[in-house]
């Protein structure tokens, strides 16, 4: 009887699996991946043409050495992250399609210590790892519009995408998720997350730096987020 039950279960599972069009599923996933890569390339090419990119080895290598422990202790392939440093006073960093991570020199200068900087970068890496970037763009721009830009140039749409990525917030739930994931990244790498919370709190205050602080305006309720991290 047991043998018959096992056979029946096997064929039941087999019948269910046979109803799934795996070829179609993988083709859809492959198409999504191709779209994301194309978008990432197009957006980055636009940034390269309009911004000043930092290639100084002393700066690039220092940032890379800071990121290595975060990646190593959290199972993230360092080479999968395409990190770019832009010479700009704005205190900002943002994630882009296809694992691009843009960091402004204004953010690096504003952070009083490495832990604070890594907290911010961990937050953006969490957006990348959680596929939040494409979710955000699909919701705010529209998947059909995103697909159209990969098949032909559209300056207005491209500008809107860049604005969405660099100057608008994610859903509150995704922001909280990214904060908490960043804290996990830090703790797994034996890095104190409290300076990250301190950084959020300081930037939430009304001071001269505030006018350059895009990261706070696109990540609202920084004081409340700081308290959540500390708790």
Feature map (PLM): residue ranges:
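A Zn2+-metalloprotease active-site environment signal
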Residues: 1-231
């Amino acid at each position: 009887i047991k043998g018959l039950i096992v056979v029946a279960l096997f064929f039941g599972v087999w019948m269910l699996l046979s109803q799934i069009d795996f070829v179609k599923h993988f083709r859809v996933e492959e198409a999504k991946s191709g779209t994301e890569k194309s978008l990432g390339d197009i957006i980055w090419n636009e940034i390269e043409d309009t911004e000043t990119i930092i290639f100084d080895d002393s700066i690039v290598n220092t940032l890379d050495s800071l990121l290595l422990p975060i990646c190593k202790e959290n199972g993230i392939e360092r080479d999968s992250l395409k990190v770019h440093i832009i010479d700009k006073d704005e205190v900002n960093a943002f994630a882009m399609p296809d694992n691009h991570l843009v960091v402004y020199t204004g953010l690096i200068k504003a952070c009083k210590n490495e832990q604070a900087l890594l907290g911010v970068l961990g937050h953006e890496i969490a957006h990348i790892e959680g596929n939040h970037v494409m979710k955000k763009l699909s919701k705010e721009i529209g998947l059909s519009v995103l697909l159209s830009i990969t098949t032909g140039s559209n300056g207005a749409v491209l500008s809107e995408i860049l604005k969405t990525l660099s100057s608008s917030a994610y859903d509150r739930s995704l922001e909280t998720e990214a904060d908490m994931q960043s804290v996990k990244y830090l703790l797994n790498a034996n890095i104190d997350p409290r300076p990250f919370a301190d950084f959020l709190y300081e930037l939430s205050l009304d001071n001269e730096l505030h006018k350059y602080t895009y990261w706070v305006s696109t990540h609202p309720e920084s004081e409340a987020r700081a308290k959540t991290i500390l708790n």
